């Protein structure tokens, strides 16, 4: 039996990188997309996957461009001859108060964080057979909570669960499942960016409101995504699963 193949966008760091390593440990080959302007070295993901005993091909990708996304899926087929899973993880995060919001900032955010998910799933589905699985990474910012000075980000992330629910129904006759993951506060390079996100101090402060007493790790989100693409979740589709250490169910003090 041929090993399965997963396509991951935003695989150079954070959740995407952790997922690539998790897949490697379970024998799944990885085709990862990375944004060329991203400061993180994509070779680091390749090295970690190889250390875990897996195979990974990292290719440049702009999820804001349909041709780029289509090319990634086609290259996955050329390299491995099949595509079983697709995880839309790539995302943009920038702080922008409403009164400073420009149409360009708004459009860029939705183009990457929402339309980019659609592009990824559209490209992957063209090559998937029955038993395929799609997972999109949303956020509690928009998916559950609001977030001041990030209305464009929250709007995009709020749209992801709706997209996944609709695609779950549409793609079910093809034997393809589609789910969303809604992470809470997870320590990643993106969340550690104090200019556009919480930063180290903000994360430490926020952790005090989390019932489990800490922020999450990228590998913990990766484990959930891996479950959602596995046969262990074969009857699960159209769902949006929050992974936040209990933050969104805590009663106010």
Q: What does each model-found stretch correspond to?
A:
Residues 12-13:
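Conserved glycine-rich cofactor-binding loop
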Residues 126, 169-173, 234:
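Alpha-helical segment proximal to the catalytic Tyr-Lys
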């Amino acid at each position: 039996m041929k090993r399965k193949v997963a396509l991951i966008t935003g695989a150079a760091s954070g959740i995407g990188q952790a997922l690539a390593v998790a897949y490697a440990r379970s024998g799944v080959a990885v085709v990862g997309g990375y944004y060329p302007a991203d400061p993180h070295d994509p070779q680091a993901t390749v090295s970690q996957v190889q250390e875990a005993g897996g195979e990974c091909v990292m290719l440049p990708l702009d999820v804001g461009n349909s041709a780029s996304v289509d090319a990634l899926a086609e290259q996955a087929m050329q390299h491995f001859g099949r595509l079983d899973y697709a995880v839309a993880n790539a995302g943009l995060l920038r702080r922008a108060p409403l009164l400073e919001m420009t149409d360009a900032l708004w459009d860029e955010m939705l183009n990457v964080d929402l339309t980019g998910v659609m592009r990824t799933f559209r490209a992957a589905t063209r090559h998937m057979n029955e038993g395929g699985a799609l997972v999109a990474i949303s956020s509690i910012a928009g998916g559950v909570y609001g977030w001041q000075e990030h209305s464009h980000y929250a709007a995009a992330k709020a749209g992801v669960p709706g997209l996944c629910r609709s695609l779950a129904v549409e793609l079910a006759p093809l034997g393809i499942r589609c789910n969303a993951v809604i992470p809470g506060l997870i320590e990643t390079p993106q969340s550690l960016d104090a200019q556009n996100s919480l930063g180290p101090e903000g994360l430490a402060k926020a952790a005090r409101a989390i019932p489990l007493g800490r922020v999450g790790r990228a590998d913990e989100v990766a484990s959930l995504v891996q479950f959602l693409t596995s046969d262990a979740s074969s009857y699960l589709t159209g769902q949006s699963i929050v992974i936040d250490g209990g933050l969104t169910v805590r009663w106010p003090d």
